[in-house]
């Protein structure tokens, strides 16, 4: 309820009772912080309560009625708004919200008795012997509030001249019981001589500070950790308070951490998360614009199913931002560079989108139709948004913008010519200058669309050197669930095929070919099958003589068991040696254990020639043969037959 209504209503009622002193009485009540609820109770309560209160205030102010003779006070009343009563013992009179005054009576000029507004409500007085001593002036609050008001002293005996008491304490307790609906009967927990609203400064003086009877003193004083003020800070709820910790309002927010508009106000971290979500939505919107631009350039379908969902998502986001009390651009004041780039890219995207909704007109210079005529004609195909024809004497071109790109396709499919006001009009598709990409850029853009790599920057290459550290929007955010699953399956199949190919190369074994001199000759050099040589053939002649027959036979047999390759026929070797011992290369036959057929093998005449004999006997053919074959042979100078199993056994 408005405080002005309660005050004016109470003032009107007091004027009806005390027309001369009504301003003083209402001013006294307002100076001592009577709450709106208290004033309204007095204004709408019984008239006896108001008369008792008026009499009490008049006694405090030292105002007496003309029909009631009163004794002249020996000393003026020390009622002063700036008076500060000293904080002494219990014998001294102290006030909780009101100034002390002393009223001298003829019978006892110096006798005083402390009383408070609490005593009036509780029905006790300083000189009343029937009141329990454990109840003190500050022990009973008003409706769970600590009562700190209207304390004064008055005479303990009746006024001799008046013939009656000014106010009966018990009667005042009954009359003002509405102020003590939920009065507690607890014992004192603090020193009764120290009022709750007293504050002591460095000089030991007390200060009176009380806001209202209807306001909780503990909440006002900041005992709950807010530091002052019962109202939340509006600037903090919007994200920033320039006063910081020194702000007199609460930086805590409403219940459930929400303010009146539903915005999180007490958690800067949550506000940062909200800003981050907003930034991600801006990136998503920018990527969507670039995707639509690429689709229009390459002549793809105008709208896919996920694009409709993106339109709905962006529309919901725009509606949510429009409902904010501080607008959409407030978050981006700290990052103008990024915001400008995004706005520029979106503006370019909007322009490109508008290009698909426009057509180019050519007509004779002597045409007389107006913009309205063009709009009326093309409205037959669809909604016309704008018509632009230059204001020239000889005009020959113009532009028409439609609300939907599909209308442009319908107009172009209609063909030429069109007749507007008997003028021949030709329609052509609208193309922006400087927007045509070269073939390389179109291929790159097509690859990005197929792979789903959409960059948030506005460059066609997808590279922004000024913002390389920013993350790019993932491709899977723009695809449906089935498309994502298909891509995952394809990726898994590709990885599986790569793994199988890698294992095949590691364990590569070439198949055996029969009756092929060349393949059997190069078998030992294939991948995965190293070449094996006979132990007896690699030994020197001196070491061979030291071996006895049994040892040599054992070595040869072990070699044959480990490596079942075609074995050299000893008889063929001896025959070849006897027939062509002087030749540089000897030809011997290989015996294939499986088929029993013989394979002709070219053997070098000398594997380790001397330095002098190399120049004389080494030719191009022998050098090529020595590089391909690694089988041991006999020395050329001695012309000894090669060591075989038959020779060792002899």
Swiss-Prot record:
Ranges of compositional bias, category Basic and acidic residues: 581-590
Region annotation Disordered: where it falls in the sequence: 67-162, 566-650
Biased amino acid composition, Polar residues: 141-154
Domain RRM: 357-433
A Pfam family the protein falls into: PABC_AtC3H46
InterPro entries named in the record: AtC3H46-like_PABC-like, AtC3H46-like_RRM, Nucleotide-bd_a/b_plait_sf, RBD_domain_sf, RRM_dom, Znf_CCCH
The entry's keywords: DNA-binding, Metal-binding, RNA-binding, Zinc, Zinc-finger
GO MF, any single term: DNA binding
C3H1-type Zn finger ranges: 232-254
Signal peptide: none
PANTHER family referenced in this protein's UniProt entry, alphabetically: RNA-BINDING (RRM/RBD/RNP MOTIFS), ZINC FINGER CCCH DOMAIN-CONTAINING PROTEIN 55
Full protein name: Zinc finger CCCH domain-containing protein 55
Record organism: Arabidopsis thaliana
